[in-house]
Amino acid sequence: MRFGFVKVASAIPAVKVADCKFNAQQTEKQIVIADGKGVQIIAFPELNLTGYSCGDLFAQSLLLEQAEFALMQIVNNTRQLDIISIVGMPVMVNSTLMNCAVIFQKGKILGLVPKTYLPNYKEFYEQRWFTPSVAHPDSTTVRLCGQVVPMSARLL
């Protein structure tokens, strides 16, 4: 912190639909660059590890497994950095698919925040694939990348 301020950045890496490995590599590059510039918190777009427009592929367990593996790679490869990172990915919670922000730092996943308001008009069709956070109104824990992680729309 300098003068009481926290340096925050947002990044929009190149993304290939359903190519979690590529998307993870691009995300990791941006995290490393931001950390090198003294950024303390970096946020990425929703579903950046899978791509937003996967459509019915979100129902495929292979995509969900690859997204989790991609997250694990990023978390492990950036464990020596101080930066707090927030990435977007689908996460299965008690047989419901959630569109989540995943927060991590120094090799530890700090929490999951599921999306609350899912659009369902014009080109947006999120309610077809995802469940809003109101389905899990209370804080809970989920297992992600071998870690037990708190999850809540009100996670602080």
Annotate each predicted stretch with a short phrase:
Residues 1-156:
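Enzyme catalytic cores with a strong preference for nitrogen-chemistry domains
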